[in-house]
């Protein structure tokens, strides 16, 4: 089972079909429009386990969470929902002993009405699972996570995900607060990107105070705000006006020029970030150029998606960008994600692993 943004089930299904085929796991996706989830039915027993072990979760763009389904209950009796789940899981010899329980729903308005029930149900369900030896007596982040996903009252999927190959967040969504002094809500996109793409223990080194960043298409400064908050200096490139609160920090230089033509005068930039409303292929190529020229070491940028053929567009743009870097002998690490705070767009992170002198 995979969670995704409502309206992106088709893209999520296309992606899991492709990835499963690459691992020689065969099946078909069950897709319900605007449901916020996709169920991939494997033809052979044991293949769901094969997928959650062998398919790198971080390589999935449109999935927020991934877990192997052990059972589906379509009509749990309201007077006792716990016993049928315990009975079914006890039959599964391969079901792992779990260290955490998440009782969730897909991210739709209808399903989220069940969240209050999910919270109340968690404590008795956890106690019952521990009593049966299906969960460890103490929470353990190094053990599998047991998921119970309610898609409607009495209708749920039960399964598990593996630590290190799942989303660490409940429902696959990081809980971020909008900072009152940020100039726009887009600030949460970049903050979420840092959480998703950069391991927390590397923040001090890779998002260090005193670094220089460039923000293309910066105004009014939602993304710049995240860099300034981390005590970086920023070249803000936009013909529009920047928020006064950011200008007053003394940490930013505002360049009123076209983002596609800007070149930093001093080549001491670590980060390039970009959230421009432009053709995705054009933005992806521009980011490749910045890394190839050694103008930046890491990039986070958004690609706006077309109305139709979104998955194909994403595959094409990413493939072209990878080929451009490979042909120019640039070593890199690339990850793409349809973030919770993204709408008709995806966010890409590239870390350049080659030591390139700026030119």
From Swiss-Prot:
Write out the annotated subcellular location.
Cytoplasm
Cite the InterPro entries for this sequence: RlmM_FDX, RlmM_THUMP-like, RNA_MeTrfase_FtsJ_dom, rRNA_MeTrfase_M, SAM-dependent_MTases_sf
Q: Does the keyword Nucleotide-binding apply?
A: no
GO-annotated biological processes = methylation; rRNA processing
Q: What keywords would UniProt list here? A: Cytoplasm, Methyltransferase, rRNA processing, S-adenosyl-L-methionine, Transferase
Q: Which GO terms describe its cellular component?
A: cytoplasm
Q: What is its EC number?
A: 2.1.1.186
Residues reported to bind S-adenosyl-L-methionine: 186, 219-222, 238, 258, 275
Has the keyword S-adenosyl-L-methionine been applied to this entry?
yes
Q: Which residues of this protein are catalytic?
A: 304 (proton acceptor)
Recorded catalytic reaction(s): these are:
cytidine(2498) in 23S rRNA + S-adenosyl-L-methionine = 2'-O-methylcytidine(2498) in 23S rRNA + S-adenosyl-L-homocysteine + H(+)
Q: Name one Pfam family in it.
A: RlmM_FDX
What family does the entry list?
Belongs to the class I-like SAM-binding methyltransferase superfamily. RNA methyltransferase RlmE family. RlmM subfamily.
Q: Which NCBIfam families match?
A: PRK11760.1 (NF008734)
Describe its function. Answer: Catalyzes the 2'-O-methylation at nucleotide C2498 in 23S rRNA.
Q: What is this protein called?
A: Ribosomal RNA large subunit methyltransferase M
The source organism is: Vibrio parahaemolyticus serotype O3:K6 (strain RIMD 2210633)
Identify the coding gene: rlmM
């Amino acid at each position: 089972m995979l969670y995704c943004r409502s309206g992106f089930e088709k893209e999520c299904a296309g992606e899991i079909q492709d990835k499963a085929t690459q691992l020689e796991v065969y099946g078909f996706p069950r897709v319900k429009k605007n449901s916020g989830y996709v169920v991939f039915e494997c033809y052979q027993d044991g293949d769901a386990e094969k997928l959650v072990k062998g398919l790198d979760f971080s390589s999935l763009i449109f999935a927020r969470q991934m877990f192997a389904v052990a059972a589906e209950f379509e009509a749990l009796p309201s007077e006792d929902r716990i016993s049928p789940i315990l009975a079914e899981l006890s039959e599964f010899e391969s079901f792992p002993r779990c260290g955490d329980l998440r009782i969730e729903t897909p991210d739709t308005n209808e399903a989220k009405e069940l969240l209050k029930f999910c919270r109340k149900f968690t404590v008795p369900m956890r106690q019952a699972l521990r009593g049966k030896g299906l969960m460890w007596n103490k929470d353990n982040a190094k053990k599998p996570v047991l998921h119970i996903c309610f898609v409607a009252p009495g209708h749920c999927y039960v399964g598990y995900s593996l630590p290190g190959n799942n989303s660490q967040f409940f429902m696959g969504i990081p809980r971020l607060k909008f900072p009152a002094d940020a100039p726009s809500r887009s600030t949460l996109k970049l903050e979420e990107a840092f959480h998703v793409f950069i391991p927390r223990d590397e923040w001090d080194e890779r998002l260090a105070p005193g670094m220089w960043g460039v923000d293309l298409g910066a105004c009014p400064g939602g993304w710049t705000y995240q860099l300034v908050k981390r005590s970086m200096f920023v070249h803000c490139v936009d013909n529009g006006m920047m928020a006064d609160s950011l200008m007053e920090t003394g940490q930013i230089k505002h360049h009123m020029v076209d983002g596609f033509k800007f070149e930093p005068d001093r080549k001491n930039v670590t980060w390039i970030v970009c959230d421009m409303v432009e053709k995705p292929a054009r933005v992806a190529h521009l980011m490749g150029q910045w890394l190839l020229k050694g103008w930046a070491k890491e990039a986070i940028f958004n690609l706006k998606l077309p109305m139709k053929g979104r998955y194909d567009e994403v595959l094409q743009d990413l493939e072209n960008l990878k080929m451009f870097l490979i042909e120019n002998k640039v070593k890199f690490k690339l990850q793409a994600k349809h973030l919770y705070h993204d709408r008709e767009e995806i966010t890409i992170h590239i870390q350049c692993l080659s030591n390139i002198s700026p030119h």
